[in-house]
Amino acid sequence: MRVMTSRDAQLYELKKKIDELKKIRGRGTELISLYIPAGYDLSKVMQQLREEYSTAQNIKSKTTRKNVLGALERAMQHLKLYKQTPENGLALFVGNVSEMEGVTDIRLWAIIPPEPLNVRLYRCDQTFVTEPLEEMLRVKEAYGLITVEKNEATIGILRGKRIEVLDELTSNVPGKTRAGGQSARRYERIREQETHEFMKRIGEHANRIFLPLLESGELKGIIVGGPGPTKEEFVEGDYLHHELKKKIIGIVDISYHGEYGLRELVAKAADILRDHEVIRERNLVNEFLKHIVKDTGLATYGEREVRKALELGAVDTLLISEGYDKVRVHVKCNNCGWEELKTMSEEEYEAYKKRIQTCPKCGSQNLTFEKWEVAEELIKIAEEAGSNVEIISLDTEEGQQFYRAFGGLGAILRFRIQGV
């Protein structure tokens, strides 16, 4: 098990912020996206924003003009907080997010990315520009997967925790015959030639898929699998490009083909890929399940239980599903002091805001709502306690099971605790 690196935590939080930003739509071209590369002079950015402010005063629509000017003012105020551009650069997203016409709610998101920004961009549009940040989420390392039988083959890729089928091929290689004499020998020669041609076709398709990944430095290895000797014949023959043959790191016996075959190939290659994310994730979820099934007291799930275990310093590894979307909501009446703290989904939050229009104690409409991600809060508590943190994807069967059966939040414990 590993401690989740700060970069892993940043990537998880970055994905959540990108998802939030992509949902926002402006009423006009009034949402500002600003990307400042690492090492760029902030004074030049401020000068550009002042020029944009001057230009924005000529916008015909009064509402759009007001919102763009407000967003630019907010951006310039925020940039004054920095003496210089952060080490990895800075991305600002500013604009009116109110869904009510005539109501202004200028919000700002400041994101220091987990790796250096190399793009400089200013855009005022109906949506925020998130593509440069999304590229940072893309897993760069990839493993090629090939399953080979006499009459069918599947080519795929393992990238991060996702197994993707890229190509499926079938052949007309005839089955073995029981006939004897010259007919049998002629039949066998035809069969061998058909097999050879099919292998060539597999190699050509694999070369077309994997060579670009090799050239970009993304391809870390190739694993070949199949139910019989055909896979060895394919590997030993001159079917793959010689540079790709050097990347073969394992040959594995499997029973299935197609997508199931690729999944079996990855599972059977666990020793080869033992440090890879998908194998580590499978092992972690299985360890969690083992403790739950055997009732060892060394695993727990659910927000209340996990939060208590974290606060007691009992968590060895915090497990959070990518699909976990719970938020903590704090609402307070500024008139009488009534307040409420609840955990709910994003969807439930929207309904909750519409339902709580007035204070249930004094009837005042002077309410303040505060909302934050439960996952981000628990990650911070875990890091302070020295606990491991693992984000569990939805791309594996184990990840899907963890999300559906346990709500996507659980923990493996260092020691047993009462009441959890």
Swiss-Prot record:
Q: Where is the protein found, in the record's own terms?
A: Cytoplasm
Per UniProt, what is one Pfam family of this protein?
Answer: eRF1_2
Q: Which GO terms describe its cellular component?
A: cytoplasm
Q: Which SMART domains match?
A: eRF1_1 (SM01194)
Keywords for the protein's UniProt record, in alphabetical order: Cytoplasm, Protein biosynthesis
The UniProt record lists the keyword Cytoplasm: yes
* Coiled-coil parts of chain: none
One of the record's GO molecular function terms? translation release factor activity, codon specific
Question: What InterPro entries does the annotation carry?
Answer: eFR1_2_sf, eRF1_1_Pelota, eRF1_1_sf, eRF1_2, eRF1_3, Peptide_chain-rel_aRF1, Peptide_chain-rel_eRF1/aRF1, Ribosomal_eL30-like_sf
Top-rank taxon, per record? Archaea
Q: What PANTHER family has UniProt attached to this entry?
A: PEPTIDE CHAIN RELEASE FACTOR SUBUNIT 1 (PTHR10113)
Similarity section: Belongs to the eukaryotic release factor 1 family.
Subunit details for this protein?
A: Heterodimer of two subunits, one of which binds GTP.
Role played: Directs the termination of nascent peptide synthesis (translation) in response to the termination codons UAA, UAG and UGA.
Q: By its UniProt entry, which NCBIfam families does this protein fall under? A: aRF1_eRF1
Q: What is this protein called?
A: Peptide chain release factor subunit 1
- Annotated source species: Pyrococcus furiosus (strain ATCC 43587 / DSM 3638 / JCM 8422 / Vc1)
